[in-house]
């Protein structure tokens, strides 16, 4: 198989975990279960087939450095589980746009000079797949980078809660260019969203009505620091909330569901603590309560999914699939163009990996009566 040339936008904790992970699993062999990987071999592509071609950031101490050095630069504070040798990949100065909010500006000194020509660099480095790790609330920056991806002729993995793959106008532009996009908003391996989704689906399947629920999240990384600026949270709250409510079997009042980040606790570093509470009605109208506490290292938890999303994006490129790639988007992302249960989405992504034609465009699942339309008309104001 050919190599997968990957460019990274935003060299933060998530990028650090992905780069470390590619090195960590580079010599993994065999076909047995490998802890941390959903797929060692994904249609012939292994983690060792991923190589980094370019990186973009605005941080003064990251721009100009080798990617292998920049991933360990503060304020990055994720766990260091691999020592990555120099990659020969410099971090380029990207545009700032709306990427740095009121809280981040105190910890992210901006590199001097003008932004470099991103589309040109992507072409010159023969990049196949661009992965976006921009901060929450980077609406303009995400759309700007999406345009550069289109101009450079790359596939796009949109890990941030800015709606690109799930918006018809953007999805159409990728389809017209014959370029795949997997998005939007990465779903961790075993994170708050997927645990909450599966429990919600379990309630429905077992005949329990979910009456009220909350999901509270605390973390110590710059993602949680950035999200203290509530004005940047609109897309994030929409994304996390609909990921859960899409699994319901009945309508739920907006006041009875609360999902979102809650606070920044610096000493947690890149760890995230999540508290989920669910109150329901079961047999005989008898109440039921469920509480879950989840503790994870946030960024490795997402990298375990991105390492598959990148390979699926390259598969789509190889197969000439353009536009939103529904199967991997539905399994890997919180806000895909079309929601399925996680069991359904897993079956679809396995079929896609095998090359089953129908997996590229799965049949429409009729939304349940309470669900929002999948094309999110309210999101047009985010353009």
Q: Across the structure, where does each feature detected by a protein language model lie?
A:
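Gly/Ser/Thr-rich loops at beta-strand to alpha-helix junctions
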Residues: 10-16, 134-140, 160-166, 187-193, ...
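Short acidic, glycine/serine/threonine-rich loops at helix termini
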Residues: 19-21, 65-68, 168-171, 194-196, ...
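Active-site-lining helix/loop region of Rossmann-like oxidoreductase modules
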Residues: 9, 48-51, 62, 73-76, ...
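N-terminal glycine-/serine-/threonine-rich beta1-alpha1-beta2 phosphate-ribose binding loop
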Residues: 1-145, 233-237, 274
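Rossmann-fold NAD(P)-binding glycine/threonine-rich loop
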Residues: 136-151, 159-180
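Short catalytic-loop micro-motif centered on adjacent basic/acidic residues
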Residues: 130-132, 156-159, 182-185, 213
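Rossmann-fold dehydrogenase core element
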Residues: 173-186, 207, 211
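C-terminal active-site/capping subdomain that shapes the small-molecule cofactor and substrate pocket
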Residues: 39, 274-383
């Amino acid at each position: 198989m050919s190599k997968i040339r990957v460019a990274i936008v935003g060299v933060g904790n998530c990028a650090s975990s992905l780069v470390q992970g590619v090195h960590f699993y580079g010599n993994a062999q065999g076909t047995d279960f490998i802890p941390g990987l959903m797929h060692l071999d994904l249609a012939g592509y292994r983690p060792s087939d991923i190589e980094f071609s370019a990186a973009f950031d605005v941080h003064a101490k990251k721009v100009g450095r080798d990617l292998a050095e920049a991933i360990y630069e503060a304020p990055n504070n994720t766990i260091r589980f691999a020592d990555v040798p120099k990659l020969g990949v410099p971090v380029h100065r990207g545009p700032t746009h709306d990427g740095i909010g009121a809280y981040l500006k105190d910890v992210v000194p901006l590199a001097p000079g003008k932004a470099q020509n991103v589309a040109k660099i992507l072409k010159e480095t023969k990049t196949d797949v661009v992965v976006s790790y921009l901060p929450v609330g980077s609406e303009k920056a995400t759309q700007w980078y999406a345009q550069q991806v289109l101009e450079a002729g790359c596939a796009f993995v949109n890990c941030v809660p800015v709606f690109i793959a799930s918006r018809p106008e953007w999805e159409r532009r990728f389809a017209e260019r014959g370029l795949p996009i997997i998005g939007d908003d990465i779903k961790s391996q075993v994170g708050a969203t997927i645990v909450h989704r599966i429990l919600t689906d379990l309630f429905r399947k077992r005949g329990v009505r979910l009456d009220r629920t909350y999901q509270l999240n605390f973390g110590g990384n710059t993602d949680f620091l950035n999200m203290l600026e509530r004005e940047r949270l609109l897309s994030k709250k929409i994304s996390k909330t609909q990921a859960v409510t899409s699994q319901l079997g009945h309508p739920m009042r907006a006041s009875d569901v609360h999902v979102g980040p809650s606070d920044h606790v610096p000493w947690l570093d890149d760890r995230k603590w999540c508290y989920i509470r669910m109150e329901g009605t079961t047999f005989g109208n008898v109440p039921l309560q469920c509480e879950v506490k989840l503790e994870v290292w946030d960024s490795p938890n997402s990298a375990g999914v991105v390492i598959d999303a990148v390979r699926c994006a390259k598969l789509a490129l190889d197969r000439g699939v353009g536009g939103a790639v529904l199967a991997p988007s539905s399994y890997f992302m919180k806000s895909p163009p079309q929601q399925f249960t996680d069991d359904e989405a897993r079956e679809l992504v396995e079929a896609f990996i095998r090359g089953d034609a129908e997996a590229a465009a799965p049949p429409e699942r009729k939304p349940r009566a309470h669900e929002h339309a999948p094309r999110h008309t309210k999101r047009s104001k985010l353009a």
